[in-house]
């Protein structure tokens, strides 16, 4: 029983160390610049703009439109509007 407690504490400590640090050490998304000079983030020429939300990035509801979430996705796959699996969402960075 003692081994299980020690293993549990070590697992929680490892998870805490692997968690991202708050404050100035957060990872910033690569937005690819601004869109037409209006300071709105835009995707680079090598990326496609994909709209999705949470698990909707991988499995989209048929006919669902974009809400407030937008992602830049680097992929050679075509944009599949209304498809069940969005291939572009597998390599994405969120646009703020």
Curated annotation (Swiss-Prot):
Principal location listed in the UniProt entry: secreted
Segment forming the signal sequence: 1-18
TM region(s), chain numbering: none
UniProt note: phenotype after gene disruption: Does not affect pathogenicity in a corn seedling infection assay nor the production of microconidia.
Keyword Signal: yes
Keyword annotations: Cell wall, Disulfide bond, Secreted, Signal
Subcellular location: Secreted; Secreted, Cell wall
Function: Aerial growth, conidiation, and dispersal of filamentous fungi in the environment rely upon a capability of their secreting small amphipathic proteins called hydrophobins (HPBs) with low sequence identity. Class I can self-assemble into an outermost layer of rodlet bundles on aerial cell surfaces, conferring cellular hydrophobicity that supports fungal growth, development and dispersal; whereas Class II form highly ordered films at water-air interfaces through intermolecular interactions but contribute nothing to the rodlet structure.
Family, as annotated: Belongs to the fungal hydrophobin family.
Name by which UniProt lists this protein: Class I hydrophobin 3
Taxonomic placement: Eukaryota, Fungi, Dikarya, Ascomycota, Pezizomycotina
């Amino acid at each position: 029983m003692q081994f299980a407690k020690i293993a549990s504490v070590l697992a929680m400590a490892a998870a805490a160390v692997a968690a991202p640090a708050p404050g100035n050490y957060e990872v910033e998304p690569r937005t690819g610049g601004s869109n037409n000079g209006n300071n709105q983030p835009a995707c680079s020429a090598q990326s496609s703009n994909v709209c999705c939300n949470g698990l909707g990035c991988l499995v989209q509801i048929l006919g669902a439109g974009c809400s407030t979430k937008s992602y830049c996705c680097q992929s050679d796959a075509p944009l599949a509007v209304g498809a069940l699996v969005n291939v572009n969402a597998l390599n994405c960075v969120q646009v703020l």
